[in-house]
Amino acid sequence: MSQIVTGADPEPFVTPTTVSPQRIFWATWLGWMLDGFDSAMYSYILVATLTELLPASGIAVNHANIGIYGGLLFSIFMLGWACSMFWGWAADRYGRVRIMCLTVLVYSFFTAFCGLSTGIVMFAIFRFIAGFGIGGEWAAGTPLLHESVPENMRVRLAGWLHTATPTGLFLAALVTLMVGSLFGWRGMFFLGILPAFLTIYLRRNIPEPQRRSALAKPAFSALFAKGQAQTTWAAAALLACIIFGLWSSNFWAPTVVATKLAAAGMTVAHAQQMGAVAGLITNVGTLLGCLLMPWITGRLGSRRWTAVLFFLGSLVSVVASYSIAIQLADNLILFFVLLPVLGFFTNGVFGLFTIWLPEMFPSVLRGAGSGFAFSFGRILGAAGPTLIGAVAALLGSYPTAISLLSLIYVIGLPFIALAPETANRALAD
């Protein structure tokens, strides 16, 4: 097994007492919430953005091209995420807070730069770099929370941490509804600079956790050493399934609603607003799933069985929402009714992994392991939006394409058994 070289004998694990757990939680939560806000804006203003940028790039604006290029740009953004495994290793080596600040600066500035785009290529480059920054925030922030709060609060706060994502998505939808038509899509992207101000607070108020291996210099290859490799690959496979499923299902809800209503004669601006409403409703379910996650895992007493529940729930909710409500019944009202259930399972499942994933790795590999699992997941997940756009263009139906690709949750079930059961165990040093 590969050895992890340390610069001194390890000190006992000490939880900081100079900073309240609540302050650490809210600082981490705020970073992830603004992260969600920046990443979600695109799905709410997709139609308006491509309506301007496609002609500027010599591409016709039509239903098929919006699907194809919209999916391609989603995938480019997620490839940026996929390249962000560097941040997790850096957080283990150089500190959680320092690296978290750098990731926030990268994604906030390059999200704002998207508003300066004059064509598809420039926009894609900015989205890729923004994705690179966003992908690293989780790998630094989640270990920071796990290692900085008392054990008796850790699972509860970690489960609630993912409420930041639906809150960010909710805020993005709300801002789109309130000022999207006034600011336009460029103005919406300019708002992405706001998270940069969070770094001032982080650097001044949040210390590095006093970890047992504070002086360790982890080798990235230790993730694949004997005794660790199965956990690493199982975690990566599970993240791949839920990321692919998420980006292939509920993040398309605003676009499905907007394109369906625009095809029925509604103005693009009004259809975009209704798409934002769909996002708001979906996020209500996501928020509920995250809030209940610590309770659900406690009642089931197993991280694995909780994962099985949410994988199967995700599959059923995707098929019910898209195949039954949209494809068979052609009923937008029923679709809106099912959206909270869709959000509860497909996005709420991430609340489980804010608890489970950091528990799978020792402290010196926690950032690298979390970062690798998410990055690997994003590599596969990046194919989801492109496949949705391509299959939808081929079949002439977003709902059919989305339902077909929801089988990813079935593929993921065997990997749950390969991941370690960490329920009722203290966080490993």
Report each predicted region and the residues it spans:
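Conserved MFS/SLC helix-loop-helix module at the cytosolic interface between two early adjacent transmembrane helices
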Residues: A82-T118
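Extracellular/periplasmic helix-loop-helix junction of adjacent transmembrane segments
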Residues: L46-S84
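Helix-to-loop junctions at the C-terminal end of transmembrane segments
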Residues: C83-G95, G289-S302
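Extracytoplasmic gate region of multi-pass secondary transporters
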Residues: S43-Y44, A229-L287
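C-terminal ends and interior cores of transmembrane alpha-helices
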Residues: L105-T118, L312-A329
